[in-house]
Structures are given as C-alpha cells and as structure tokens.
Amino acid sequence: MPKLKTRKAAAKRFRATGTGKIVRRKAFKNHLLEHKTTNKKRQFSKMAIVNERDEENVRLMLPYL
C-alpha cells in the first residue's frame, strides 16, 4: 500500500497540541486593522481550537499529525 500524502496547504495552517487537539489561527488579522479595536485585534491573535465537526476533515488531510 502506498504512503498517504499530506495536504501541504492544510499542514501550513493547522498544528496539534500536546493533548491531540488541532488548533488554527483566527481570521480578520491580516489587513484593514486601523478601525479594529485593540481588544479585538488581541482576540484575533490567539489560537482557536478546530471544531469537532471540522476536525474529522482536517485529520484526513493530515494523516501524520
């Protein structure tokens, strides 16, 4: 059986925590930041845990995560 391939686009966007959860970056933090409050920008800087419904698809894209 051939080796499973990793989706490289997904590999750049997701990481696994020590407990096995998958984390991602939040959106809305790349540009047009002038009108956003400091509090909102700080919240967007934090990592978010991938929803359990989406986690199944992410794990299929990253077989060696």
UniProtKB/Swiss-Prot annotation:
Q: Is Glycoprotein one of the keywords UniProt gives this record?
A: no
Gene Ontology terms: cellular component: cytosolic large ribosomal subunit
Concerning Pfam families, the annotation shows: Ribosomal_L35p
Q: Note the InterPro entries from the entry.
A: Ribosomal_bL35, Ribosomal_bL35-like, Ribosomal_bL35_CS, Ribosomal_bL35_sf
Which key words tag this protein in UniProt?
Answer: Ribonucleoprotein, Ribosomal protein
Q: Which GO terms describe its molecular function?
A: structural constituent of ribosome
For this protein, the record's PROSITE patterns field holds: RIBOSOMAL_L35
One GO biological process term: translation
- Which PANTHER family did the record assign? 54S RIBOSOMAL PROTEIN BL35M, LARGE RIBOSOMAL SUBUNIT PROTEIN BL35M
Q: Which HAMAP family match?
A: Ribosomal_bL35 (MF_00514)
Please give the family membership noted in the entry: Belongs to the bacterial ribosomal protein bL35 family.
What's the protein called, per UniProt?
Answer: Large ribosomal subunit protein bL35
Question: Which species is this UniProt entry from?
Answer: Nostoc sp. (strain PCC 7120 / SAG 25.82 / UTEX 2576)
> Which gene name does the record give?
rpmI
